[in-house]
């Protein structure tokens, strides 16, 4: 009986965590007019007062980056890109939250920065809530990650939480351009934030570039673009990918279906996504609800989904004509989200593939992944790690699948802290006995030859 009670308690905890993931991510009410921007400045508005913005005039979005050229040639974006000013809009803006203790060289430049790139639907306020010490979202991550004495120690590092081009505090389609907004790439996300770090915050080098999910993907790109010059000293992608085109069939399939869900909305089809002239209550929000429902089906392991009571599940199941609590989770969520913003976010991944460029990475590299991730398969992450000289690969299993990326720094606490602090030894801490509390995760670390670099 005692064992059964424990199993039941664990099951309840897992179901509760799965539901928490849905509601922990951005969601707030939007006024019924069509004033721009259509979406808020922050994913977690309670932390909006901490966010700062920076303008980058005449930045070319959507251009081609020649990685063999001097990085100064991409200072204002890739060749052939489009500036927002040329479309009659304000200059490009980026946003961030900074905490910690800056240490400066004799030129007054910061030399101890750690950057935290944001995930697919989030921003700096979300990552601050989940990871910074003492915030209400810490429980979602199994505890704080950033703060005094934490894995990323703010007594030792200057930590910058970054927004990513296309959502929340950065320039985005829902600022008013809609489908006229230039298509952007992960290279654009990184380059705009490089300009923020270098020009505005006067950061001379980044000790570690990290992030979860799409934030991890950006960390990979930081390594490709800015480790050869020494600007980025180490990268720590947690649950990211180095390709989301045909080199990753499951990932590409998943997000192509997500894109198709947006486009399936009759209001989208009637306007071809050009609907900003309509009242907000006539925008194609159901397609966005459909997208989230599709993604969430495999956002957690099937045992988690199977253990969730139907009266809770149907809040996450998409219905074209919902009744009662059907689709309630997504109806609430998309009130402050715009379908065009997410259409562009999805589009940015379909042509993304840096596998052939991984050899450019000269940074210390720790690749962290969740073995049970059903969106971004662990075998692909392992292959990417093997392509980088001296990279270390660490993984663990968790029933919350992809969403376990947020708790990874606490599951692999010793390994990650020693990597961040550059105190790795041959014993590689955290190999045995690591667990995620109720999740029963088992951690493993692999050390290829040539770690010391």
Placement of each model-derived feature along the sequence:
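Catalytic-loop region of hydrolases
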Residues: 32-113, 428-453
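Short beta-strand/loop motif that positions the catalytic acidic residue
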Residues: 361, 367-369
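Cap/lid segment of the alpha/beta-hydrolase catalytic domain
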Residues: 142, 146, 150-200, 248-279
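Catalytic histidine-centered segment of alpha/beta-hydrolase-like enzymes
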Residues: 399-410
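Conserved hydrolase catalytic core segment
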Residues: 205-209, 213-249
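Conserved alpha/beta-hydrolase "acid-adjacent" motif
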Residues: 374-380
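Alpha/beta-hydrolase-fold enzymes
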Residues: 231-332
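N-terminal cap/lid subdomain of alpha/beta-hydrolase-fold enzymes
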Residues: 97-174
